Amino acid sequence: MIVVEHVTKKFERFKNKREKEEFFADNDISFQANDGEIIGILGPNGAGKTTLLRMIAGILEPTEGSITFDGMNYQNQEIEIKEKIAYLSGNTKLYDTLTCYELLKMCCDIYNVDKEQEDRRIEEVAKVLKMESFLYNKIANLSTGQTQKVNIARCLVHDPKYYILDEATTGLDIISSQIILDFIKQERKKKKTILYSTHYMEEAENICDRVIMINKGKVIKSGTPEEIKESTKTTNLRDAFFALIGGNLDED
């Protein structure tokens, strides 16, 4: 279980050539993600989704608030938490000179996967993500979809407890996207805790148990997809989101 309580992140930016001002990337965000749940973090580009997930993944420190993982926090149990996290960002760069297998082997070493289990784990992940045909190819020679599968595979070799997935299917074709979504659903059955950020509302509606809608760093609505559609008198999450913001997507 992941519990986010009153989390805020402030940055400074230039107001003009001489003056700076503070702005809120995320402002007083709270929610709980239970075991065996897929929680969608929804919103347009610039809404604060990535900043929020980077704080949950321990990459950024919140200005205010707390984040706990089954009672553990980064202040006292950072190593224990990070050993159980899978963090996927669409901006992650891979080592192009390595083969997929070599990269996954390296990730096994980083996460202290039992040496006798490394090849078994790599084979399992490759099979689930349908990577067998290019497992021994260099990453530099892969397609966009294949590269994203490797990016996901590197997060999985240590069998994480908590998934923090930021735009996992962006830029992928329909088949590759579906393989990844099917995998996420399978991990839910194993009682993993999954946070899934996307701006694809239809995708979230299909796989998420609950969603948290964010705009301009603030939570504007949370609940199951059905609850949100019912409360906004709409038939899909996209229309619900626009109803909640009054159709205004202007970014600060």
Feature roles, as predicted:
Residues I2, F24-D26, K82:
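Conserved structural motif at the start of ABC-family nucleotide-binding domains
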Residues G65-Q75, E80-I81:
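Conserved ABC transporter NBD signature motif
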Residues T97, K138-L142:
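Conserved ABC ATPase signature
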Residues K105, D109, E116-F134:
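Conserved ABC ATPase "signature" region
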Residues Y163-E167:
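Catalytic Walker B motif of ABC-type/P-loop ATPase nucleotide-binding domains
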Residues S222-G223:
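ABC ATPase "signature
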